[in-house]
Amino acid sequence: MENVLKNDWGPLLAPEFEKEYYRKLADFLKEEYSTHVVYPKKEDIFNALEYTSYENTKVVILGQDPYHGPNQAHGLSFSVQPGIKTPPSLLNMYKELRDEYGYDIPNNGYLVKWAEQGVLLLNTVLTVRQGEANSHKGKGWEHFTDRVIELLNEREKPVIFILWGRHAQAKKKLITNTKHHIIESVHPSPLSARRGFFGSKPYSKVNTILANMGEREIDWEIPNL
């Protein structure tokens, strides 16, 4: 898992790939990929950073670890590959979007359109063993993705961090630069969405902040495939 990042994340994150924790993580992943089914595919691990460069990041939506079912994960938090049923949390995200903007719920969960507009869809852990949620927790990815958040925190241009649920909100301690914005609520999971996610209007809050900054707003509508 060497540094394959081709955009501005490459030099920014280069020191991480040389650190002891990352070498141990790379050894662990080499073993995991050769002995188990692991998601996403190796070439998709860093997709969040590939689709959304450092300079172009306007918004961060922080997830936990990748979906662990076949053909779901492709390196973007909450997103699934085309042709795969929309998972429950993402369906609730779409319901909130419908309530905010009147958009129809799309027939897919492929969020590349968001990523291409500057929405960094970052999981805190970037790989998982099939059928075993959190199986790669504590193996080193957290150090790596914390560094991603720290680098964004160091940026002069403001970033909007969307933190849903306690796991994401635990990363608030890394966001110390008062230029940045934090939008938080409970997680869109069916277990918690009715306790404050529905009606929280995260998408229009983002666009209000962007408009006030003179930045292009995010077109949140996901097209049918």
UniProtKB/Swiss-Prot annotation:
The keyword Hydrolase applies. One of its GO terms (cellular component) is cytoplasm. GO terms for molecular function: uracil DNA N-glycosylase activity. It comes from the Bacteria. Its EC number is 3.2.2.27. Keywords: Cytoplasm, DNA damage, DNA repair, Hydrolase. The active site is at D65. InterPro entries: UDG_fam1, Ura-DNA_Glyclase_AS, Uracil-DNA_glycosylase-like, Uracil-DNA_glycosylase-like_sf. Excises uracil residues from the DNA which can arise as a result of misincorporation of dUMP residues by DNA polymerase or due to deamination of cytosine. This is Uracil-DNA glycosylase. It comes from Bacillus cereus (strain AH187). The gene is ung.
